Amino acid sequence: MKEKSYVEDIDRSIYDIRDAEHDAFRMEEGLTPAIIDKLSKEKGDPVWMQQFRLQSLQIYNEMAVPDWGPSIEGLDIDHIATYVRPNTAMQNDWKNVPQDIKDTFERLGIPEAERKSLAGVGAQYDSELVYHNVKDEVAAQGVVYTDMESAMKGEYADMVRKYFMKLVTPRDHKFAALHGAVWSGGSFVYVPKGVQVSIPLQSYFRLNAKGAGQFEHTLIIVDEGASLHFIEGCSAPKYNVANLHAGCVELYVKKGAKLRYSTIENWSKNMYNLNTKRALVEEDGVIEWVSGSFGSHVGCLYPMSVLKGDNSRMEFTGVTFAGSGQNLDTGAKVVHAGKNTSSYMNTRSISKSGGISTFRSSVVVEKGAKGAKSSVSCQSLMLDSQSRSDTIPAMDIRTKDASVGHEAKIGSISNEAIFYLMSRGMSEEDARALIVSGFADNVSKELPVEYAVEMNNLIRLEMKGSIG
């Protein structure tokens, strides 16, 4: 009897669960002031947020679609439902989440992950969080981990108003303005001075509704001398119409603090993923980005770090896998503003079956950023002649006292490596999957073991049928 390969053993169905839609409320399609007012009232916004949404809509209408990057002609905002409320309020006890939603998250492993390796979990379904909880021992340290709406309306209202969309503003680009107008859901995190959160927090975003958008906002403030690892996971079932994800992440890393922000994205192949992420790092602070991008039809994602304080540091480690029908345009940006700052980008991109993978790096060294050091390394692996991989570096150096370097490599899987692994009993497909997993090891080794396994499973799923 022939043994199944480890590629075949993976259950593909868990990533493409499509629930029956039981929405409590679905906003009509389109973008008008009346729709934004309706959304604001539906969510019970304070007056300042209602005004902010309308101002953002005005900016959105004034701005043009960016004329660079992948084509988004297949995305018609007028046919996107910008708000879909699930049939439950947010719960703090997993037992109280409706069974159909609970089944979806349980198949994705969310409750199990919470029990095993997480300090807290937020689970968003369409436009609202359905579950949020933080372990007692973490809350006892003074760590705040709640949903954005509760933070905005409760005791952290002043803090939210102080930081909300100040790092990413509606005028940054058209889809930042769209986010400002229709945002819903997301997480608020505050880590007090000196607190070391020893195990990660996670938010998981699931978009189930057909022809809808998800616009969660994540705001994290890590105070002086504190540290945190935050993990973000994303998935959606595949439909024959476009879905949109245009979330926003704002990270504030105070003096001597450290934040690692990890993302594993497995959006469906009808998704337009137009996310905006930015970090502001103070003196002696450290921001670490770990990113795995495996899904979406079109992806545009360039996390940006502003190294404001002296001796602040940024590291970006990423892997992108573009398969058939995918155009993933990703990368990272860094602005060196303080003295003796450092940044390091280390990325891997994989393309197969005609997929297009583009890596854009942007390094800016301000005039006063003496002693800045930056290193960019991008390696690409193309699995066939139909695929494409591009590297587009940009450097703006305004001081002579800086060290900046860029390295790019492109290659393919050697026949010798395939032959060697097959001589050890592997099938050709398994051999290719193993080599690709090793190529992406720079990201998986930075994740907790449960998430490293998940990422390697996603690579194996993408590699299925890669022969011929």
Over which residues does each language-model region extend?
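Intrinsically disordered, low-complexity terminal tails
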Residues: K2-A20, F25-G30, Y451-I467
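N-terminal amphipathic, basic helical "cap/leader" segment at the start of enzyme domains
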Residues: K2-Y6, I10, R26-D172, A176-A177, ...
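Short acidic (Asp/Glu) and glycine-rich catalytic loops that position anionic groups and cofactors
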Residues: D16-D19, P33-D37, E282, D396-I397
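Conserved beta-strand/loop scaffold segments within soluble protein domains that form the structured core
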Residues: Y131-N133, E137-M426, A440-G468
